[in-house]
Swiss-Prot record:
Subcellular location: Cytoplasm
Keyword Nucleotidyltransferase assigned: no
Gene expressing this chain: pdxJ
Chain residues that bind 3-amino-2-oxopropyl phosphate: 7, 18, 192, 213-214
Protein name: Pyridoxine 5'-phosphate synthase
Cystine connections: none
Sample GO molecular function, one term: pyridoxine 5'-phosphate synthase activity
Organism: Cyanothece sp. (strain PCC 7425 / ATCC 29141)
Major localization listed first in the record, in broad terms: cytoplasm
Residues bound to 1-deoxy-D-xylulose 5-phosphate: 9-10, 45, 50, 100
InterPro entries per the UniProt record, alphabetical: Aldolase_TIM (IPR013785), PyrdxlP_synth_PdxJ (IPR004569), Pyridoxine-5'_phos_synth (IPR036130)
Site (Transition state stabilizer): 151
A Pfam short name: PdxJ
Amino acid sequence: MPTLGVNIDHVATIRQARRTVEPDPIAAAVLAELGGADGITVHLREDRRHIQERDVRLLRQTVRTHLNLEMAATAEMVAIALELKPDYITLVPERREEITTEGGLDVNGQPERLQTVIDTLQQAGIPVSLFIDAEAKQIETAARLGAKFIELHTGRYAEAGSPQAQQRELETLAQGCARAIDLGVRVNAGHGLTYWNVRPVALLPGMEELNIGHTIVSRAVLVGMERAVREMKQAIQGTF
């Protein structure tokens, strides 16, 4: 079964709604790990709408599993990553007007720029993952650029309007996963996964890690972070 990376961005979203000090994402990360999280994921956005640079610095010192930093491929973010050296980086697309990340990174449209960023980070010992749609050309370009991982965007699967549409999207994810593995690229997945739709994605051959945030934080508001994480681990394993 794939491991679970818990995205704690929306703990910071609640905090930033009042520009106060609580809830504390660092405390949430500790509780998530106590609940069985295999990793902690945060997205340091250029507009700092939720996670702040201070959060990432503190998480780097306190996370005991591994820290996955999601970021845009900008000079500012590369400099921060080189200083803090998270366990790995996931490069994601970013638009200020979006509520959350919408769609995968277009690696075909910017190979030279991404090559520079990937080389810079990986030469510093930080493995790079690319958050992309499960499209053959995107996956092949990601492999050619030397990314160690891809993270397949599962939003279309999660938002499918019927069981038939969801099954088609699952098949697309399966094909993408298989193609990446054939090319020697390791595979993670995430976006829109919930307690009720995660199991089929978890069963895809070769899937290594699922990065899940909003549904866990939403449940944690009601039942607590440790229990919410334990129950997601159960959902991944098919025992929820």
